[in-house]
């Protein structure tokens, strides 16, 4: 099985909604989601090279669960790699999303490691200011910054929505070029 020095993941976190209005905007109304236990059960650690960096997109309500996920996958939390401050689609104003307490307009990508990976560029910045696109799509700039930070190493994107050059991909919206070693679920199926 191919091993990767960079794993980039944007799991389809399931959320509890508190109103009918929120149900129409939730992730579940856009794509299949997964509960935390199913995300934790994915054998992501088996894809990791001896020295590997994990970049994991999370939303603030899932922060504690995300830390459980990276531990279950065999990684140790290091820092927040990126803070995506979202701008509206049509102008440069800040996007105002939903939120359980305050109106959310940022998401974070945490960085975790297995072994002792080394960064190659100390000038990569944390804040990404960019426009939102389709629901939950992350800015392409994040991938570019990951390669600048860690180098042109074997890399895979999990839960991918596109197939960027230089990346192996796994997800239910792409033709998979990477495979998770699972007996019960075929590649790219989230129906665990």
Locations of regions flagged by a protein language model:
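Class I S-adenosyl-L-methionine-dependent methyltransferase catalytic core
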Residues: 1-192
């Amino acid at each position: 099985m191919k091993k990767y020095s960079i794993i980039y993941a944007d799991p389809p976190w399931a959320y509890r909604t508190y109103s009918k209005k929120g149900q129409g905007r939730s992730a579940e109304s856009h794509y299949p989601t997964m509960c935390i236990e199913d995300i934790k059960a994915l054998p992501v650690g088996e894809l990791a090279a001896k020295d590997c960096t994990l970049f994991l997109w999370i939303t603030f309500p899932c922060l504690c669960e995300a830390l459980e996920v990276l531990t279950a996958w065999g990684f140790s939390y290091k820092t927040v790699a990126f803070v995506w401050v979202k701008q509206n689609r049509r102008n440069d104003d800040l996007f105002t999303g939903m939120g359980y307490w305050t109106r959310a307009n940022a998401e974070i990508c945490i960085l975790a490691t297995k072994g002792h990976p080394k960064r190659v560029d100390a000038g990569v910045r944390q804040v990404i200011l960019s426009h939102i696109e389709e629901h939950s799509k992350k800015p392409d700039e994040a991938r570019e910054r990951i390669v600048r930070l860690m180098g042109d190493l074997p890399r895979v994107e999990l839960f991918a929505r596109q197939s960027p050059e230089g990346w192996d991909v796994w997800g239910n919206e792409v033709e998979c070029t990477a495979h998770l070693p699972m007996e019960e679920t075929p590649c790219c199926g989230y129906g665990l």
